[in-house]
């Protein structure tokens, strides 16, 4: 695990003590009050840093949505680039950083993150900037959300195997499905999307 700054350690201790005393996590304002500051922006930045380092998880839309991670169970996975949730886009495989998750969320080894670009999967609640947790596997079942390579370009879509073709279906009516007729194009499954992570502002 990455080392914490003095302020991050203080925030983590405040959360831990509050959980031990009250049985539920503190709000941003309660943390700010303990830190002796008036606003919550600084608290949010500390929580974001603690989440990136694998010490806690936050639940979007909840005033008390903080869960501490078991430090012995945390693991950091690489963010290996960008995948387009829209038109086909060349795959980018430069590691841009790492993101920590609990080991219990991994079904197998080799998993990695891709950052989502585009809006073709918005009805599946996948939006630009999300981190897609990808489990490498060479095949998929119907309705799986996958990262697929079509003629060397990557896309994130819902997978359907039909009689003589593969259909990669967007979850946005503004986009057309990608149809791969048998034998006409080279297509491969990079992996199945098994989780979506969104970093709160």
Swiss-Prot record:
Q: Which residues carry the record's DNA-binding region feature? A: 28-48
Coiled coil ranges (UniProt) are: none
Top-level lineage group: Bacteria
Residues carrying the site annotation Cleavage: 85-86
Q: What residues form the catalytic site here?
A: 120 (for autocatalytic cleavage activity), 157 (for autocatalytic cleavage activity)
Q: Which GO terms describe its molecular function?
A: DNA binding; serine-type endopeptidase activity
Enzyme class, spelled out: hydrolase
**Which controlled-vocabulary keywords does the entry list?**
Autocatalytic cleavage, DNA damage, DNA repair, DNA replication, DNA-binding, Hydrolase, Repressor, SOS response, Transcription, Transcription regulation
Catalysed reactions listed for this entry = Hydrolysis of Ala-|-Gly bond in repressor LexA
Q: Name one GO biological process term.
A: DNA repair
Q: Gene3D superfamilies in the record, alphabetically? A: Umud Fragment, subunit A, Winged helix-like DNA-binding domain superfamily/Winged helix DNA-binding domain
- Whether DNA damage counts among this entry's keywords is yes
The EC number on file is: 3.4.21.88
Keyword Manganese assigned: no
Annotated Pfam families:
LexA_DNA_bind, Peptidase_S24
Q: Which family does it belong to?
A: Belongs to the peptidase S24 family.
Q: Which PANTHER family match?
A: LEXA REPRESSOR, LEXA REPRESSOR-RELATED
| Summary of the function given for this chain in its UniProt record | Represses a number of genes involved in the response to DNA damage (SOS response), including recA and lexA. In the presence of single-stranded DNA, RecA interacts with LexA causing an autocatalytic cleavage which disrupts the DNA-binding part of LexA, leading to derepression of the SOS regulon and eventually DNA repair.
Subunit (UniProt): Homodimer.
Name of the protein in its database record: LexA repressor
Per the UniProt entry, what species is this protein from, by scientific name? Geobacter sp. (strain M21)
The organism's taxonomy opens as: Bacteria, Pseudomonadati, Thermodesulfobacteriota, Desulfuromonadia, Geobacterales
Q: Gene encoding this polypeptide?
A: lexA
